[in-house]
């Protein structure tokens, strides 16, 4: 039952990680305008994502424009797009595989490969979490580097957007989910091997008597003397 509970917790975390990765990938707020120095008094604030950028006016109106070209974007944005899409695809595949391998499902109940399928789902969750964490950490490092650089003008500095925080949390959820699924299946396999060895132990002790030792008669197992009652 412990492994079943761990699998459920791992799958829920993996599903939350997938949903969070999808939302973080689509949000246009990977980095937002920084109001420091001469840029404190500005009429327009900008926020940029992987697929679009938005401008928020002082009147409260927000306008978002999708990038007209993808090949003309910076290399870090293109790499982040590819990694986030790949991470979402791998995490989706991990959700499907984990459903087949979990003990609470009806798929392949009599098959011994059920635990291996669950472990494969956990490995895919770990891979998806890593692919989602790399672009988030990469953009986070670039934002902090430009923010504290004296060579970058204040109007070109950005702050960390909420999409990056969501991406970090989602990737950690996917990593933890994969580790939990792999650990639950490995512990269940070790426990089953122990039970098999324990059940086979009495059969091994019921062996034939040693050479030179006469077999015991049934009366020898009785601790009471039969002649005492005559």
From Swiss-Prot:
Gene Ontology cellular-component annotations: bicellular tight junction; cell junction; cell-cell junction; intracellular membrane-bounded organelle; nucleoplasm; plasma membrane; tight junction
Keyword Membrane: yes
Catalytic activity line of the entry: Na(+)(in) = Na(+)(out); K(+)(in) = K(+)(out); Rb(+)(in) = Rb(+)(out); Li(+)(in) = Li(+)(out)
Superkingdom of source: Eukaryota
Protein name: Claudin-2
Glycyl lysine isopeptide (Lys-Gly) (interchain with G-Cter in SUMO) cross-link site: 218
Ranges of the Extracellular topological domain: 29-81, 138-162
Keywords, in A-Z order: Cell junction, Cell membrane, Disease variant, Disulfide bond, Isopeptide bond, Membrane, Phosphoprotein, Tight junction, Transmembrane, Transmembrane helix, Ubl conjugation
Taxonomic lineage of the native organism: Eukaryota, Metazoa, Chordata, Craniata, Vertebrata
Any GO MF annotation of the entry: paracellular tight junction channel activity
């Amino acid at each position: 039952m412990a492994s079943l509970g761990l699998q459920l917790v791992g799958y829920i975390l993996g599903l939350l990680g997938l949903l969070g990765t999808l939302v973080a990938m689509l949000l246009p707020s990977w980095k937002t305008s920084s109001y420091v120095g001469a840029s404190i008094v500005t009429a327009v604030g900008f926020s940029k994502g992987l697929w679009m950028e938005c401008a928020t006016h002082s009147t409260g109106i927000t306008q978002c424009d999708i990038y007209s070209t993808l090949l003309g974007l910076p290399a870090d944005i293109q790499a982040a797009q590819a990694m986030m899409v790949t991470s979402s695809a791998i995490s989706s595949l991990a959700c499907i595989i984990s459903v087949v391998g979990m003990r609470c499902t009806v798929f392949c109940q009599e098959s011994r490969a059920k635990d291996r399928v669950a472990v494969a789902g956990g490995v895919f969750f770990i891979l998806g979490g890593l692919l989602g964490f790399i672009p988030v950490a990469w953009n986070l490092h670039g934002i902090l580097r430009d923010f504290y650089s004296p060579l970058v003008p204040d109007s070109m500095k950005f702050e960390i957007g909420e999409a990056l925080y969501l991406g970090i949390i989602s990737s950690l959820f996917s990593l933890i989910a994969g580790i939990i699924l792999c650990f639950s299946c490995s512990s269940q396999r070790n426990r089953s091997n122990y039970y098999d060895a324990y059940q086979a132990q009495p059969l091994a002790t019921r062996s034939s008597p040693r050479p030179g030792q006469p077999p015991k008669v049934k009366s020898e197992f009785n601790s009471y003397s039969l002649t005492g009652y005559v």
